[in-house]
Regions:
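Short, ordered loop/turn segments at secondary-structure junctions
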Residues: 74-76, 99-100, 130-132
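Conserved acidic residues
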Residues: 27, 44-45
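C-terminal substrate-binding/catalytic lobe of Rossmann-fold NAD(P)-dependent oxidoreductases
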Residues: 2-6, 10-38, 51, 120-220
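Hydrophobic beta-strand scaffold residues
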Residues: 26, 69-70, 93-94
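Rossmann-fold NAD(P)-binding glycine/threonine-rich loop
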Residues: 73-96, 105-114
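N-terminal Rossmann-like NAD(P) cofactor-binding module of classical short-chain dehydrogenase/reductase
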Residues: 46-47, 70
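Rossmann-fold NAD(P) dinucleotide-binding segment
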Residues: 39-40, 52-73, 80-84
Length: 220
């Protein structure tokens, strides 16, 4: 497998290190992925960790150029239908996620199961998330994913509280409160390393799956 990294910030450098450790060829890391030559792109998986604005501008070209694409960028889900249509049109495999951490995806599975158990009870749900001050979207894509799971499971949408503090990699908490008890579930990331590891796992999965896939639906 050959990889092009779209976005060469902190996450891009972490992904580069994971690829190197796994012996996966990194063809290039670029802040201008649209300029990658077509003959190179068609042989590569693109791993995109940019900004919402950059992905919104670049996705038509990314979908047309690359063999497969892994998208860890969030903040574009309001145009999900247009994005998916572009990848469908070019028959390009897309794996996307609000969070590629394996631990977070286990957290998703736990919340889904908890909601199945609590749905007959009188519980008020809420979601809290804390991220570093550089995080552009609020609530985070992960917080929205947790809220969606809760709404589907309990039939009521939780309130989401978002905070941006220092260099916090990401902490997400789901609470369920009734008149008799409270359940609290928390995932705390110690670094962004887990996101990079999961993104590379997703890139490897593009050799086994096709179409448009959400990461959690593949691994859970």
């Amino acid at each position: 497998m050959k990889v092009v990294i779209s976005g060469y910030g902190k996450m891009g450098h972490m992904i580069e290190a994971v690829l190197q450790r796994r012996g996966i060829e990194l063809v290039m890391a670029s802040e201008d992925v649209c300029s990658v030559p077509d003959d190179i792109a068609k042989e590569c998986v693109c791993i995109d960790f940019t900004t919402p604005e950059a992905f919104r501008a670049n996705y038509p070209t990314i979908a047309a150029k690359f063999k497969a694409v892994v998208v860890g960028t969030t903040g574009w889900y309001d145009i999900k239908d247009q994005v998916f249509a572009a990848f469908d049109r070019h028959n390009t495999t897309l794996i996307w996620a609000s969070n590629f951490s394996i631990g977070v995806n286990a957290f998703f599975a736990a919340i889904q199961r908890v909601c199945e158990v609590l749905k007959e009870g009188d519980y008020t749900p809420s979601v809290k998330e804390i991220h570093h001050i550089h995080k552009l979207d609020a609530p985070s894509g992960t917080a929205k994913s947790i809220a969606d799971l809760i709404e589907k499971g309990l039939g009521r949408a939780p309130e989401i509280e978002s905070k941006r503090i220092g260099e916090v990699p990401g902490t997400h908490t789901a609470e369920f409160v009734s008149g008799v008890d409270k359940l609290v579930f928390t995932h705390e990331a110690f670094s962004r390393q887990g996101f990079a590891e999961g993104a590379v796992v997703a890139a490897l999965l593009t050799e086994k799956v096709t179409g448009i896939q959400e990461f959690k639906d593949i691994i859970l």
